[in-house]
Amino acid sequence: MKKIIALILSMISVMALFVGCSGKQNPPESSTPEIKETVEATISPVVYSSEAIKKVEETSAGNFEDWLGERSVYGMASNSVIESPFHTLKINGQDVPVYTARSRRGAHSFAWIDVEKTRRDWHVDVELTTAEKYGKCVVLPESTEVAVGISNNVYTCRLYAYDTYTFTFATDANASVTDPLLAPLTLMVTEEKPFKLPTEYETVTIEPGVHTGRELVFTQEFTAYIIKAGYHEVAGIKLPSNSLLYIESGAYIKGLDQELGLAVIGGEDINNVQIIARGIIDCGSMSYDGNKHPFWFSRVEDLSVEGLTLVNANTWTMCFCDCTNLTIERNLLLSYRNTSDGIMMSDCVNGAGRYNFVRTGDDGIEFKATGWGRGANVGYNCVYEYNDCWTDRVSAYGLIWENMRDLSNVTFRNNSVGFAYTSENGYLCPLEIRLGANSNITWKDILYENIELYYVDCATVITVKVSSSDGGGLGGGGAIVDSVTYKNISVNACREGCVALKMHFGEYAGGDITNIVVENMSFCGKVLTAEDKSNSSYFVNEAGDKFETGLTVK
């Protein structure tokens, strides 16, 4: 649980400390602290069949090293997910399967449990055993405040909340940070969502099997389409208005490389659509050509998406264009191919992405204004919050490149970055504004607030960049960036030479950069102040006067 601590003056000369997530005043020092009583939760693990997910020795590769070596930044790969060769997991004494997918840097394992809904406060007890012995275990994000006990190669802890918990390890107990190459495991803890048929809805059931062509292009409204647990091969699922897609726990959907233009799951010009899932979409057999997407919705009003696991995306993973009243919650994305951007909201209004875990081969979580949806929306009032993102190549949370329309009032709030690695580019970084398509377009009123970063292996933590390298005949290259605030940014550790912020304005770019504020940024233990603005170890000026007049540090 992410915690925000607020200091409140309650009486003259009397100061009381409140914890924001509980709303309760701390007792006086002389009183006995209140002990929170919880009950052991009833859990349901997400389990996939052996037909869908195999042990690594049962794959064509035959061993883990060769399986991992089948990665290609553009090409296809078989067996996108395997049973984890690294972990054995018990929760409340119950076996919970752990699965492993490839990432850009090594592999990433995952497990998922649903907690039965209860009116009482609950807990789950975790016992994780690893194939190797590690001296240190840190659960990310650190704001979850999980204390881990270690005994040889067994790691134990107690969890109290729906959240995303990633177990990371280091060989040395005294290591300053853990190592993302050492068997990271993300545990999704979510509330159980039993199927409930909406009033006056009919049902259509899709049994496991091969579904080619346009077999699953649905047109009947007021219908719940139920994907049964088991192994499916699917060319594409297209949803109509007033529909529910319910993907049962344990459903494994392998996308087929056919019916270009039809997403594995998608829809357009529709309204009132809900997707509830506890299943996997595997895009490992889909080639990269830009015409076949894992998940794409355009011009949709009232859309909610929850509970998907998407692996090995062949191109941009979850795309929402010109959508209004949108929620994207508790999804797990693990990909490594080039252009496998994670979650994109483009030209969306009243959108929210929450409690997602994203690790991809390109940008992680982003806002854009592409115009690709061909709708009338001007992006406004959207937020990403309580997400966890690791980046292996480009940005974690960004406003990236395609500025074809105006965009305003967008927020990244209460998010975390586990590990941020990028290609050797001086501007790619975890918190990134990088624009250059249209100098007449304004992106403004942008807020990054309460962002924690565990380890940054990039040239900079924050980039604000306007360039002119690709005008595309759309008003000339560049952008207008105005009123951006970075507030309460906390960087735990970074590589040598990493700076806090770099601002760049291209020599031939059009537009402007104005009103950039950095407030209360903790950079590897140092809180940055106005005096640090002139220190190039923290702030790099490649924007001339726009840096001098447009950036405020406080």
Model-assigned labels for residue ranges:
Residues 1-8:
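Positively charged n-region of N-terminal signal peptides that target proteins for export
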Residues 6, 29-229, 234, 240, ...:
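Extracellular "leader-to-stem" segments immediately downstream of a signal peptide or signal-anchor
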Residues 18-20:
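C-terminal motif of bacterial Sec signal peptides marking the signal peptidase cleavage site
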Residues 22-24:
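Bacterial signal peptide processing site
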Residues 159-161, 212-220, 232-244, 254-276, ...:
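Extracellular beta-strand-rich solenoid/capping regions of secreted or surface-exposed proteins
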Residues 236, 261-264, 294, 317, ...:
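Structural detector of coil-to-beta-strand junctions
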Residues 242-244, 249-250, 271-282, 301-312, ...:
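Right-handed parallel beta-helix
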Residues 422-554:
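Extracellular beta-rich repeat passengers
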